């Protein structure tokens, strides 16, 4: 067990690398993912087991699968696994290395619920679920605050990296979310929130800029809404709960009511498709190479959808065990974290 030194907003935190013997991994082939119902022409195989409640997935620059987990005991902010899927499958993650990130030494014990990986540096970006901060875990094994002062950061793909390595993250402005912020306004100033803009907020920052970190979200100018925020003459927009980067500077979002929307370079938010009605919570998005969008509906929906570039919605998998994070590899295979079953499955065309 080797210690990793990590920093959190100036305070030193400790993370632990748990190294468990990698021997005794028996050669095997991927086995069919029982219980998962996939569309015709596809198959689902189990590629990793023994991961306690995997909630987020990403690929590192070498093609390894990065998995975010809360751990078995719930006594840490997160556990991070890095799995090499080029060998015998399924991988027994109980025998794989993992990084354990402990809670901060303060009263709040917030877990990490969102993950993005810089495809160039391999740095991990970790967001607090139902929290206010985003961190970067770099190759130097230090945990550094990147953004603070959010009102309410959700889990799932509430943050993402675009094609230029800029960090995009979602927030929401309302009297209720202000109460969850790190520095809520006192009751005497609550009218500033009630009479101001209420609705989704989208921010984009470049962590590599020569500017001091962390950035304060409450002092940043959002890219949505852009310019002067609209006055509350109508009902606030639905909350944006997931984001992924599309071609160019475009971004694709999922709203809390199942709307798939696209934000173009002109600043206009356009409806792409509507998913079936349901409770969308801890959802995740992934962009296909042809411009299609994959949506993991979360543990209430238990389905994965594909939205074609033309906006047609199809279901590619259902009856999943609490689907969480999703990611596409270079060959177009879709990896899915089945949180309730403590495993990762791969959905790919039949061969």
Pin down the residues of each PLM region.
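Surface-exposed loop and turn segments in beta-propeller and other repeat-based domains
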Residues: 42, 93-107, 148-151, 210-234, ...
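Beta-rich, blade/repeat-based domains predominating
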Residues: 50-62, 105-121, 150-166, 171-173, ...
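Conserved beta-strand positions in repeat-built beta-propeller and related beta-rich domains
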Residues: 50, 67-76, 118, 125-130, ...
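A short loop-to-beta-strand structural motif that recurs across blades of beta-propeller domains
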Residues: 77-82, 133-136, 200-203, 259-261, ...
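Blade-level signature of beta-propeller repeat domains, shared across WD40, Kelch, NHL, RCC1
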Residues: 323-351
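Short loop/turn segments that connect beta-strands within beta-propeller blades
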Residues: 84-89, 137-142, 206-210, 263-268, ...
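A short helix->beta-strand "capping" segment at the edge of beta-propeller domains
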Residues: 33-51
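Generic structural signal for coil-to-beta-strand starts
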Residues: 64, 122-123, 142, 166, ...
């Amino acid at each position: 067990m080797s210690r990793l030194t990590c920093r959190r907003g100036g305070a030193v935190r400790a993370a632990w690398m748990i190294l468990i013997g990698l021997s005794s991994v028996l050669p095997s082939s991927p086995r069919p993912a029982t219980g998962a119902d996939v569309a015709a022409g596809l198959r689902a195989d189990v590629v990793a087991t023994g991961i306690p409640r995997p909630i987020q997935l990403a690929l590192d620059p070498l093609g390894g699968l990065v998995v975010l987990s809360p751990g078995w005991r719930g006594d840490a902010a997160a556990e991070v696994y890095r799995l090499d899927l080029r060998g015998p499958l399924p991988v027994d993650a109980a025998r794989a290395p993992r990084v354990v990130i402990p809670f901060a030494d303060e009263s709040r014990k917030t877990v990490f619920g969102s993950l993005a990986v810089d495809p160039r540096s391999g740095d991990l970006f970790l967001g607090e679920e139902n929290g206010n901060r985003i961190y970067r875990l770099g190759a130097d094994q230090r945990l550094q605050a990147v953004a603070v002062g959010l009102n309410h950061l959700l889990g799932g793909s509430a943050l993402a990296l675009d094609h230029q390595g800029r960090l995009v993250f979602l927030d929401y402005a309302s009297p209720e979310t202000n109460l969850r912020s790190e520095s809520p306004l006192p009751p005497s100033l609550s009218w500033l929130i009630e009479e101001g803009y209420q609705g989704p907020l989208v921010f984009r920052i470049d962590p590599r800029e020569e500017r001091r970190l962390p950035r304060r979200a409450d002092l940043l100018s959002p890219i949505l809404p852009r310019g002067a925020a609209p006055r509350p003459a109508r009902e606030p927009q639905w909350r944006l709960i997931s984001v992924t980067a599309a071609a160019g500077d475009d971004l694709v979002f999922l709203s809390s009511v199942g709307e798939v929307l696209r934000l173009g370079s002109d600043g206009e938010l356009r409806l792409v498709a509507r998913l079936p009605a349901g409770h969308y919570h801890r959802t995740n998005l992934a962009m296909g190479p042809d411009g299609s969008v994959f949506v993991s509906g979360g543990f209430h929906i238990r389905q994965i959808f594909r939205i074609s570039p033309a906006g047609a919605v199809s279901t590619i998998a259902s009856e999943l065990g609490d689907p969480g994070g999703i990611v596409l590899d270079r060959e177009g295979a879709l990896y899915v974290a089945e949180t309730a079953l403590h495993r990762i499955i791969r959905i790919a065309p039949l061969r």
